């Protein structure tokens, strides 16, 4: 009976630790809702170390002044930052004036994918 209790407690502690390991987006550059010039690199900073082989992002132009179009994927390189909690998205060319959305997927040691997005505008 004692072994069962110890095993149950150990499993409970392990599960609570894993549940806390979901990465959360802490900040981004440009920040959510920012208006500015075309960024050379977009930085996403997370609460947990990322598993780069399962994490990624897409950069999408969602609106261009004076033009109606569907969301348009933009060519960009996605890489890990120097910090394992950072993801870098580097557009392959300067972004034209418009609205953008970074659709990200982050996976940490718990292996559960977490998704989200960051929107910003280029003037």
Task: Identify the function of each model-found stretch.
Residues 1-8:
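Bacterial N-terminal signal peptides that target proteins for export
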Residues 14-18:
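N-terminal signal peptide c-region/cleavage motif recognized by signal peptidases
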Residues 34, 51-120:
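Acidic, low-complexity Ser/Thr/Gly/Pro-rich repeat segments typical of extracellular/periplasmic
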Residues 10, 31, 89:
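Generic anion/oxyanion-binding catalytic loop in active/binding sites
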Residues 20-58:
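N-terminal non-catalytic regions of secreted/periplasmic and cell-surface proteins
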Residues 10-12, 46, 76, 107:
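Intrinsically disordered, low-complexity boundary segments flanking structured domains
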């Amino acid at each position: 009976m004692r072994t069962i209790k110890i095993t149950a407690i150990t499993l409970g502690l392990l599960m609570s630790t894993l549940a806390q390991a979901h990465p959360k987006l802490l900040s981004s550059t440009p920040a959510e809702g920012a208006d500015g010039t075309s960024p050379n690199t977009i930085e996403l900073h997370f609460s947990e170390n990322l598993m780069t082989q399962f994490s990624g992002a897409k950069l999408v132009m969602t609106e261009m002044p004076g033009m109606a179009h569907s969301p348009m994927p933009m060519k960009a390189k996605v890489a890990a930052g120097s910090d394992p909690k950072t993801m870098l998205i580097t557009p392959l060319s300067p972004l034209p004036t418009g609205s953008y959305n970074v659709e990200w997927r982050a996976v940490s040691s718990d292996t559960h994918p977490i998704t989200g997005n960051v929107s910003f505008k280029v003037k």
